[in-house]
Amino acid sequence: MAKSNYITRAGWQALDQELKYLWKEERPKVTQSVSEAAALGDRSENAEYIYGKRRLREIDRRIRFLSKRLEALQIIDYHPQQAGKVFFGAWIELENNEGEINQYRIVGCDEFDPTKNWISIDSPVARALIGKCVDDEIEVQTPTGKAVFYINKIWYDTKSLY
């Protein structure tokens, strides 16, 4: 399945900051250390030189990825018409059949974070939630079988969007 190109404004800004940091701070530091290591002589057994070149390739790879990805991403901002329904950027409180309650936020695939309960728009749960309202029921196929969830609450964190 192809990754979606949606991202929150805060997520786009975080990726942009990472790109700027890598380009303006990290890469120059590593380039300087590689130059210093190269000046020491034999490069074939120079661990600092070899490690520095490897790190420089990793940084360049990440810079290329971020540059292309940021161009392709589409920032999705909250719109008042979304109130009451689940759309991109929504926080949702779900309850399962056992009465367990969890809260999730639907974000882009570049910013999903299980430790924050941020789920990707491309995930089966998020796809089932899109367009639903409070008190709706969704059914999702999980590795252990079908799971049913009830939507208790929907809200948008409009303060962190800008």
UniProtKB/Swiss-Prot annotation:
User: Per its UniProt record, what Pfam families does this chain match?
Assistant: GreA_GreB, GreA_GreB_N
Q: Which organism is it from?
A: Haemophilus ducreyi (strain 35000HP / ATCC 700724)
> Record's family?
Belongs to the GreA/GreB family. GreB subfamily.
Q: What is this protein called?
A: Transcription elongation factor GreB
Q: Name one GO molecular function term.
A: DNA binding
Q: Which UniProt keywords apply?
A: Coiled coil, DNA-binding, Transcription, Transcription regulation
Q: What is the lineage of its organism?
A: Bacteria, Pseudomonadati, Pseudomonadota, Gammaproteobacteria, Pasteurellales
Name the GO terms of the biological process aspect: DNA-templated transcription elongation; regulation of DNA-templated transcription elongation
Highest taxon in the source lineage: Bacteria
Role summary = Necessary for efficient RNA polymerase transcription elongation past template-encoded arresting sites. The arresting sites in DNA have the property of trapping a certain fraction of elongating RNA polymerases that pass through, resulting in locked ternary complexes. Cleavage of the nascent transcript by cleavage factors such as GreA or GreB allows the resumption of elongation from the new 3'terminus. GreB releases sequences of up to 9 nucleotides in length.
> Does the record carry Transcription as a key word?
yes
Give the coiled coil ranges: 52-76
